[in-house]
Curated annotation (Swiss-Prot):
GO terms for molecular function: ATP binding; ATP hydrolysis activity; DNA binding; excinuclease ABC activity; zinc ion binding. The lineage of its organism: Bacteria, Pseudomonadati, Spirochaetota, Spirochaetia, Spirochaetales. ATP binds at residues 36-43, 651-658. This is UvrABC system protein A. It comes from Borreliella burgdorferi (strain ATCC 35210 / DSM 4680 / CIP 102532 / B31) (Borrelia burgdorferi). The gene is uvrA. PROSITE patterns: ABC_TRANSPORTER_1, ABC_TRANSPORTER_2.
């Protein structure tokens, strides 16, 4: 019995969130999938109970000193858990918003890159391409002796190299050092004769001491070494050698420094920190290792060129400033234009000189406002070369110590590629070091797959191969893990903050596989999100490999392929929120398929399904044509999106879907509809936008950054609720207005916690602890406000209701029930009205935004762009969502989705499949048309998987 217990994780009485006293035995060392409707309690069981308790027990085992760095987790609401081992959660959250954090740094691949470049990289002079290397005396001697016996060798000590001057003192010093002969400008002289040459002081000269002439043979090593040592000593470490072997004349430069012997370019010590853009030792000094700098541009400081200077066209040079007036009066006089001339009418050449400066001296006269008002002559006269408006503003920005001024300037600046390092982040010295012709940033500019190919085919000599063997092993294994989790398309220099939650999670997963731990409980949150079916197979293989290492892998997942691969399934339900929190079925796949209570099982068995539509809308209502899309990996493609139909953009991960829709199409349409073309880039032209009147982008960004933001405030019906409470007789008798029922303003809120509902307690040896406010007991409002009740419920009680409960409670209040209806339609009946925005997933935030848009009055000419709306949705929730989206289209609107879910794709009226692969191998339109046409395309991965469903 004791042995069998150790093979299970035993959970008894789990009551966290909506869990209803759940008891479950989970087999260890297997792939366990927890399924169920959105809000049914999957994450509450996996993350908030099992992982939380495993983590908490580990934390308790370390010292108080260590705990202050590790953090402390509260005990989950569960009676008993046994069989736990150390647990690791791999969640869907952005890794870091730090611009210095990249895919290469977070996977530690870049650390190994720095190491291999420091060990076997070869430095080349940036000026002449010559190999730079430190050479010892013995190495120089051996190199010269390697030439054929009998070769004539002349050793020169370079003293002056291409410098102006008569160099009299240099020649005198050479004489005093005891040398007899010199070579000056390619001519040989006795030192006495050289002193009488009277070299022209304004011309460049080269002076070398002729140290020795040697004929190579058996007994010359000692003499050669002594002469070389002398040459290096008098020339500060440089030596030039002429070798004549009768067949050819060879000219070689040697140096004992890490510098170019020809131009003198000096390189610091080659070590790993030289290649770190986070270290002042290796970072570009201009951009401090960011690769970009903040710069002013003409469009930002002069948004309306139809205005003149006197109309205050320039936001940073107003007529109210005497200095600005002085500058522009001087410029106008010098370049012959009027201060009332619209900026757009100033000649381009003149405008360029005004913006960027010139070498011409310009006369300026500064007059105070008092002198100008009295039309007095005089003032401060000065003449100088004008640096240009943009450099002047940059200088002011760098010089100011005023925080408000800095913020004002930064709002007018934009990020530009660093002019010094060209976006490579590193110093010139670091970029001179190369392996097979590539510097370290050239390698980070490659995709994960291309990087793997580069190192797999890397040819090295015997010495370098031995030095780099272990480093290469680590690099290739990490790259292979990333490929195995479907991230072959990512570039190693990609900023980690730009990764989706799914990509970030799979990077963590790849890192964990690389660590090769065993005996661990891994808890993952929908790792298949954002993955094409082709890549999903790789991901599942990775999860199985993680299990085979001797770990327990618990996955919260809706993906059918993952469910069918699982060793054990726990299906939560039967509904969401208060209607969920129970285990409706558990066991192997066959047990779930045979369960009458399992909604998941009924979809997997085919009893319930999302049908292929009997007919599809025809694309005959016009189109929007986006021509020449070329941003990121897009290959100058022409995109045609039919209006009035349901379109899905498909393609493998990294094929360019998000770039095309979110970074090119949306800004293009948004700017055209708002008559503002400033933000348009990445395409040549857009046609047909006149046929729509509004564009709405519904993404997965949070609906708010603080605990005060919630679904009720975002969608807008909290205002209606507050006004309803303010109209109650009790509220009127107390003189309460609608503002009394807001936790954001003084009056009705609890002032001890300022409407947060909790207090932040600072601990000395522990992290900050958030505890419910002891005055309002976490209710956010003061006692007087809570005494006002509607149908027996106060404002706090209402905010604690789920959307489903609230819909029943407010069914006779149309202004409120109208909004709640749409939240239910998008599958959010389980969330609370006052649930903090910080606790909502990306998918939940997106569906709240969708509900908000649905609640508005439709014009029938709206263009919707929605990015993967099925994120976090069960089969049944997807069915509901599709009904909503199809209704939007039936009302005359256009809906365009980015989606991988095949149930959604098969319902589309029109598909545009990008690819054929990810990264550089993507960016093309592989096929477009109705699903049946896409399924026939042999080059389409989407078509390959779609074929079986039609």
């Amino acid at each position: 019995m004791e042995k069998s217990l150790k093979k299970k994780i035993i959970v008894r009485g789990a009551k966290e969130h909506n869990l209803k006293n759940v008891d479950v035995d989970i087999p260890k060392d297997g792939l366990v999938v927890i399924s169920g409707k959105s809000g049914s309690g999957k994450s509450s069981l996996a993350f908030d109970t099992i992982f939380a308790e495993g983590q908490r027990r580990y934390m308790e085992s370390v010292s108080a000193y260590a705990r202050q760095f590790l953090g402390v987790m509260k005990k989950p609401n569960v009676d008993y858990i046994d069989g736990l081992s150390p647990s690791i959660a791999i969640e869907q959250r952005t890794i870091s918003n730090n611009p210095r954090s990249t895919v290469g740094t977070i996977t530690e691949i870049y650390d190994y890159y720095r190491l291999i470049f420091a060990k076997i990289g070869k430095a080349y002079c940036p000026n002449d391409g010559r190999l730079i290397e430190e050479q010892s005396l013995d190495k120089i001697v051996n190199t010269i002796l390697s030439y054929s016996e009998g070769s004539k060798v002349i050793l020169f000590a370079p003293i002056v190299r291409g410098s102006k001057g008569s160099h009299k003192k240099v020649l005198e010093k050479i004489l005093n050092q005891g040398f007899n002969r010199v070579r000056i400008n390619s001519e040989d002289y006795l030192i006495e004769d050289a002193l009488n040459l009277n070299l022209h002081k304004n011309k460049k000269h080269t002076i070398e001491i002729i140290v020795d002439r040697i004929k190579l043979g058996n007994n010359v090593r000692v003499r050669l070494a002594e002469s070389i040592e002398t040459s290096l000593a008098v020339s500060n470490g440089y030596l030039r050698v002429e070798i004549d072997n009768d067949l050819e004349k060879i000219d070689k430069l040697f140096t004992e420094h890490n510098s170019c012997p020809l131009c003198g370019f000096s390189l610091p010590l080659i070590e790993p920190r030289l290649f770190s853009f986070n270290s002042p030792f290796g970072a570009c000094s201009e951009c401090s290792g960011l690769g970009v700098t903040l710069e002013f541009d003409f469009e930002s400081i002069c948004p309306d060129t139809s205005l003149s200077f006197n109309d205050d066209a320039f936001l940073t040079f107003k007529t109210s400033s005497s200095w600005s007036v002085a500058i522009f009066k001087g410029l106008a006089k010098h370049y012959n234009f009027d201060l009332n001339t619209p900026i757009k009418d100033i000649p381009d050449k003149v405008l360029k000189q005004i913006l960027y400066g010139s070498n011409e001296k310009i006369d300026f006269i500064y007059q105070s406002k008092e002198m100008e008002a009295k039309e007095l002559d005089g003032g401060f006269h000065y003449s100088k070369t004008f640096e240009g408006l943009l450099p002047l503003l940059k200088r002011r920005y760098l010089a100011t110590e005023s925080e408000s001024t800095k913020i004002f300037y930064e709002n007018l600046m934009s990020k530009k590629i660093c002019n010094s390092c060209k976006g490579k982040r590193l110093s010139v010295g670091a970029l001179t070091v190369k392996i097979n012709g590539k510097d370290i940033q050239d390698l980070t500019n490659l995709s994960v797959f291309d990087s793997y190919v580069f190192f797999e085919n890397l040819q090295l000599d015997m010495v370098d191969e031995k030095i780099s063997k272990e480093i290469l092993k680590e690099i290739k294994s990490r790259l292979k893990f990333l490929i195995d989790v479907g991230l072959s398309y990512l570039y190693l220099n990609r900023i980690s903050g730009s990764l989706s939650g799914g990509e970030a999670q799979r990077i963590r997963l790849a890192t964990q596989i690389g660590s090769a731990l065993s005996g661990v409980i891994y808890v993952l949150d929908e790792p298949s999100i954002g993955l094409h079916q082709r890549d999903n197979e790789k991901l599942i293989s990775t999860l199985v490999n993680l299990k085979n290492l001797g770990n327990t892998v618990i996955v919260v997942e809706h993906d059918e392929q993952t469910l069918r691969t699982a060793d054990y399934i726990i299906d939560m339900g039967p509904g969401a929120g208060i209607l969920g929190g129970e285990i409706v079925a558990k066991g192997a796949l066959i047990d779930i398929l045979n369960s009458k209570n399992s909604l998941t099982g009924q979809y997997l068995s085919g009893k319930f399904k999302i049908d292929v539509p009997s007919s599809r809308r025809k694309a005959d209502k016009g189109e929007i044509l986006l021509l020449g899309s070329n941003k990121n990996n897009l290959k100058n493609i022409d995109l045609s999106i039919p209006l009035g139909v349901f379109t899905v953009i498909t393609g493998v991960s990294g094929s360019g879907k998000s770039t095309l829709l979110n970074e090119v199409l949306y800004p293009a349409l948004d700017s055209r509809l708002k008559l503002n073309e400033k933000y348009c880039d990445g395409f040549k032209d857009i046609v047909g936008y006149e046929k729509i009147d509004k564009i709405i982008q519904i993404n997965q960004k949070p609906i708010g950054r603080t605990s005060r933001s919630n679904p009720a405030t975002y969608v807008g019906f909290f205002t209606e609720i507050r006004e309803l409470f303010a109209k109650l007789p009790d509220a009127k008798s107390r003189g309460f207005k609608a503002g009394r029922f807001s936790f954001n303003v003084k009056g009705g809120r609890c002032e001890k916690c300022q409407g947060d509902g909790y207090l932040n307690i600072q601990m000395h040896f522990l992290p900050d602890v958030f505890v419910p406010c002891d005055l309002c007991k976490g209710k956010k409002f003061n006692e007087e406000t809570l005494e006002v009740r509607y149908k027996g419920k106060n404002i706090h009680d209402v905010l604690e209701m789920s959307v489903f409960e609230a819909s029943k409670f407010f069914e006779n209040v149309p202004k409120i029930s109208h909004y709640l209806k749409f939240l239910i339609e998008v599958g959010l009946e389980y969330i609370k009205l006052g649930q903090s925005a910080t606790t909502l997933s990306g998918g939940e935030a997106q569906r709240i935004k969708l509900a908000f848009e649905l609640s508005k009055k439709s014009t029938g000419k709206t263009f919707y762009i929605i990015d993967e709306p099925t994120t976090g949705l069960h089969f049944d929730d997807i069915k509901k969502l599709l009904e909503v989206l199809q209704r939007l289209v039936s009302n005359g609107n256009t809906v365009v989705l980015i989606e991988h879910n095949l149930d959604v794709i098969k319902q589309a009226d029109y598909i545009i499949d990008l690819g054929p692969d990810g990264g550089l191998a993507g960016g093309n339109i592989v096929v477009s048309g109705i699903p049946e046409e896409v399924a026939k395309c042999e080059n389409s991965y989407t078509g390959m998987f779609l074929k079986n469903l039609l």
